[in-house]
Swiss-Prot record:
It is found in: Cytoplasm. Its EC number is 6.1.1.20. Mg(2+) binds at E252. Binds 2 magnesium ions per tetramer. The gene is pheS. This is Phenylalanine--tRNA ligase alpha subunit. It comes from the Bacteria. It holds the Pfam family Phe_tRNA-synt_N.
Length: 338
């Protein structure tokens, strides 16, 4: 028993002088582990007479409990001290001013779409929307685009089946509007459109804004004046605008609209390919067949339509030379438009 008391005193002394949790664990293993000092003493009970074993066993258990209790107390003390030290090192000064977070901003394409809508809403146009998954009739047939037209080819259009597709323009919204209401009609139709194309200036998904006006006595002069005023309001410049004859199945006559290069002011540069002009949209008078298929009398009503790519206008307005930058989600690029 003297050896037992000495072991306990030795163990308690070691526990008191330990300053590390890992060292404390080593002490526990040394005295209470499977091969520990006190465990070995317990194994000697078999050498004692049977009548002495209960008494000696009880004393050994009391000794083990003393050491274990001391270990638990010291472990709690060491863990508390370590926590206090860490908290002191990581102390937060609540009197310091908060760290501000940079505010977000609208995407440049969203800004462009909103700007276009605002320009036309000021002159009485309403915003109309429609489905992005369209049927062949509204995307092609109702717009006077026959079955042999190249726009129906698989390399230009994303088809789901023979009748359903991703719209290639927002013109179907114009058709649905003419089917659901009678003139006068003044709408702009912003939205996503899809075509099989991808390079520096084209994307398989892009945003388009188309406009439609149908009323009595509408002429090409009305179309020309509307587009000229819109472009000058959008770019906030007195731009030179020109109309070039073109062809679209859903308008007759049709035209492409060019503006004086906003980069070089018409002097010629890489952006305008030294021509001094930039193509920005297509337009024309609504074809009588389109009006007729929407149950609008072309003898009584006339209309004009126009369409533009939002990314194209955003590139010109903000001086961006690669369309794909709008879709890369690079915060270094997008942060410039806050």
């Amino acid at each position: 028993m003297e050896n037992l008391d000495a072991l306990v005193s030795q163990a308690l002394e070691a526990v008191r002088h330990t300053e590390d949790v890992n060292a404390l664990e080593q002490i526990r293993v040394h005295y209470l582990g499977k091969k520990g000092e006190l465990t070995q003493v317990m194994k000697t009970l078999g050498d004692l007479p049977a009548e002495e074993r209960p008494k000696v066993g009880a004393l050994i258990n009391v000794a083990k409990e003393k050491v274990q209790d001391a270990l638990n107390v010291r472990k709690t003390e060491l863990e508390g001290a370590a926590l206090a030290a860490r908290l002191a090192a990581e102390r937060i000064d609540v009197t310091l001013p908060g760290r501000g977070q940079p505010s977000g901003g609208l995407h440049p394409v969203t800004r462009t779409l909103e700007r276009i809508e605002q320009c036309f809403s000021r002159i009485g146009y309403e915003v109309a929307e429609g489905p992005e998954v369209e049927d062949d009739y509204h995307n092609f047939e109702a717009l006077n685009i026959p079955g042999h037209h190249p726009a129906r080819a698989m390399h230009d259009t994303f088809y789901f089946n023979a009748n359903m597709l991703l719209r290639t323009h927002t013109s179907p919204v114009q058709v649905r509007t003419m089917e659901s209401q009678q003139p006068p009609i003044r709408i702009v139709c912003p939205g996503r459109v899809y075509r099989c194309d991808s390079d520096l200036t084209h994307s398989p998904m892009f945003h388009q804004v188309e406009g439609l006006l149908v009323d009595e006595g509408v002429s090409f002069a009305d179309l020309k004046g509307t587009i000229e005023e819109f472009l000058r309001a959008f770019f906030e410049k007195q731009l030179e605008v020109r109309f070039r004859p073109s062809f679209f199945p859903f308008t007759e006559p049709s035209a492409e609209v060019d503006i004086q290069c906003v980069i070089c002011s018409g002097n010629g540069c890489r952006v305008c390919k030294q021509t001094g002009w930039l193509e920005v949209m297509g337009c024309g008078m609504v074809h009588p067949n389109v009006l007729r298929m929407s149950n609008i009398d072309p003898e009584k009503f006339q209309g004009f339509a126009f369409g533009m790519g939002a990314e194209r206008l955003a590139m010109l307005r903000y001086g961006v030379n690669d369309l794909r930058l709008f879709f890369d989600n690079d915060l270094r690029f997008l942060g410039q438009f806050r």
